[in-house]
Amino acid sequence: MAAESSYGFVYGVSGPVVTAEKMAGSAMYELVRVGHQELVGEIIRLEGDYATIQVYEETSGVTIGDPVLRTGKPLSVELGPGIMGSIFDGIQRPLKDIADITQSIYIPKGVSTNALSREARWDFVVSKDLRVGGHVTGGDIIGTVDENLLIKHKILLPPSACGTITFVAPSGQYTVEDTLLELEFAGRKQKFSMLQIWPVRSPRPVTEKLAANNPLLCGQRVLDALFPCVQGGTTAIPGAFGCGKTVISQSLSKYSNSDAIIYVGCGERGNEMSEVLRDFPELTMEVEGVTTSIMKRTALVANTSNMPVAAREASIYTGITLAEYFRDMGLNVAMMADSTSRWAEALREISGRLGEMPADSGYPAYLAARLASFYERAGRVKCLGSPEREGSVTIVGAVSPPGGDFADPVTSATLGIVQVFWGLDKKLAQRKHFPSINWLISYSEYMRALEEFYEKNYPEFVSLRTKCKEILQEEEDLSEIVQLVGKASLAESDKVTLEVAKIIKDDFLQQNGYTKYDRFCPFYKTVGMLKNMIGFYDLARHAVEATAQSDNKITWNVIKDSMGDLIYQLSAMKFKDPVADGEAKIRKDYEDLAEAMANAFRNLED
């Protein structure tokens, strides 16, 4: 039995917020166990010897006078092999293991299981340069575990550790708790295993933050071409219901060029999480000639809308801590938070129960600060320890403003923090134009950072993108005139702009995520398609403007009649399947089309 002083008593209960007395000596954000069922809670306010606790489980049945056990440690997560491919709830309880233990589809109250299996044995390969008498510091890699084909799990020393090695375990099979290394520092000996415990609210330390300069390619043409994000960037996807936020964040986790994915379903529908669980194991990728499931590089933190509200806040922190752990191994991690609005609503509810002063729309005044402290944990960094390595965490946060109103406090606070804004448009979604990203309001502030990458790999791309945006903007301006006076009264060059903009919108920006050929578009295909479309525009404009004064004028109708086949081929560029056809064939086909267009226009002008 624990000492008497480590117990307090329940004084009042209001939904997920419990007040306890006789809690003198406890700390902010300390983990406590409430009631006879030992529900998990966290102290969020201290006054005298009263503590206010937010409980991460259903509080029905807790009565006045129930014991509150103090644990003396903050809310923490377990880090080690076995994270990938598993499903946790908001406070890192493994849902699969709980289902196996209880044989029930419900999570019982007060259940406590280890996040990582203590029985599973992992093949540990010790680092070559570790030997007794050597010195190590925090963040050093002490060995590797091949967790699966996709993730080579590097075992790191905790950031605070350092000292002289007194014992090294040989390579072999170990559980996560077996001692692998013993250090001595200032006369104290410490043992280290594969398992690390880390408090979720404090960011993991790094050597330095670096400028991000490598694009996060997500296989959606409109995003990769017009509004690119970088590895280590922050992105917001705001949009009303049914605009396709979840589809975009799922396709990001399926096809992006990240090494590991943490997908946090925070207060969204349970069906969306089960969709992820159903789709991901079926999706495969090729690694060294072996086909393996994409689930092997994904960890899910599932916290659906019918789970307790307080755990939503924890789930975001749990997710970002897992992401930082994989970043410290030198991986590029992408974290999807779907959706941060539900998290803000949880903050609002707790804040209301505490009787704090409400600010805009009833959200607490510290909403923007909380959002910033979460988003600022993204970035590309130089990791602690040796050997030197770089890692990154990219955060993609979906925001669902009520009624699709972007002036909502959560959306406006988020836009002040993130660098990339992919605004979804209800009108586009109603026209069945997916991904429904509004190319007039979205923006990316990483254009300058990525210029070097484009110059090196796709030198013509930057000018193509600028031209593409100009065409879309011109089309928007012309559309008002067309609505007033009709198409016929426009100048010929404006007709060309309208028609090419239509091709760009329907065949470049639009993308069917449920087809083999279009669910993922590699960057070379994106650039090739854009090059031909802009090439056609330049040739057509030139032909129209060069012959405007002569007798045999070339009008848009002449071009359309004589080049129907080429225009069809422009639209059909998207049907090339990157997996079946391969890069070389697609590139050659696009070059042949460009040549055919140039010849056709030459013949037309002659």
Swiss-Prot record:
Q: Which residues carry this modification: N-acetylalanine?
A: A2
Free-text disruption phenotype from the record: RNAi-mediated knockdown causes larval lethality. Results in increased protein aggregation in the oocytes of sperm-deficient young adult females which is not eliminated by mating. Impaired yolk uptake by the oocytes from the pseudoceolomic cavities. Causes an increase in the section of the excretory canal, which often has multiple lumens and abnormal whorls. Does not affect alae formation in larvae.
Answer whether the UniProt record assigns the keyword Protease to this protein.
no
Name the enzyme's class.
translocase
Which PROSITE patterns does UniProt cross-reference here? ATPASE_ALPHA_BETA
Cellular component GO terms, alphabetically?
A: proton-transporting V-type ATPase, V1 domain
GO biological process, alphabetically ordered:
ATP metabolic process; lysosomal lumen acidification; proton transmembrane transport
Enzyme Commission identifier(s): 7.1.2.2
Summary of the tissues where the protein is detected? Expressed in proximal but not distal germ cells.
What keywords is this UniProt entry annotated with?
Acetylation, ATP-binding, Hydrogen ion transport, Ion transport, Nucleotide-binding, Translocase, Transport
What catalytic activity does the UniProt entry give for this protein? ATP + H2O + 4 H(+)(in) = ADP + phosphate + 5 H(+)(out)
One GO MF annotation is: ATP hydrolysis activity
Gene3D superfamilies documented for this protein: 2.40.30.20, 2.40.50.100, Bovine Mitochondrial F1-atpase, Atp Synthase Beta Chain, Chain D, domain 3 (1.10.1140.10), P-loop containing nucleotide triphosphate hydrolases (3.40.50.300)
Q: How is its activity regulated?
A: ATP hydrolysis occurs at the interface between the nucleotide-binding domains of subunits A and B. ATP hydrolysis triggers a conformational change in the subunits D and F, which induces a shift of subunit d. The c-ring is subsequently rotated and results in a continuous proton translocation across the membrane.
Q: What does this protein do?
A: Catalytic subunit of the V1 complex of vacuolar(H+)-ATPase (V-ATPase), a multisubunit enzyme composed of a peripheral complex (V1) that hydrolyzes ATP and a membrane integral complex (V0) that translocates protons. V-ATPase is responsible for acidifying and maintaining the pH of intracellular compartments and in some cell types, is targeted to the plasma membrane, where it is responsible for acidifying the extracellular environment. Required along with other vacuolar ATPase components for the removal of protein aggregates which form in immature oocytes in the distal gonad.
* Subunit-level organization: V-ATPase is a heteromultimeric enzyme made up of two complexes: the ATP-hydrolytic V1 complex and the proton translocation V0 complex. The V1 complex consists of three catalytic AB heterodimers that form a heterohexamer, three peripheral stalks each consisting of EG heterodimers, one central rotor including subunits D and F, and the regulatory subunits C and H. The proton translocation complex V0 consists of the proton transport subunit a, a ring of proteolipid subunits c9c'', rotary subunit d, subunits e and f, and the accessory subunits vah-19/Ac45 and vah-20/PRR.
Q: Which family does it belong to?
A: Belongs to the ATPase alpha/beta chains family.
Q: Which PANTHER family match?
A: H(+)-TRANSPORTING TWO-SECTOR ATPASE, V-TYPE PROTON ATPASE CATALYTIC SUBUNIT A
What is the protein name stated in its UniProt record?
Answer: V-type proton ATPase catalytic subunit A
Q: What is the taxonomic lineage of the source species?
A: Eukaryota, Metazoa, Ecdysozoa, Nematoda, Chromadorea
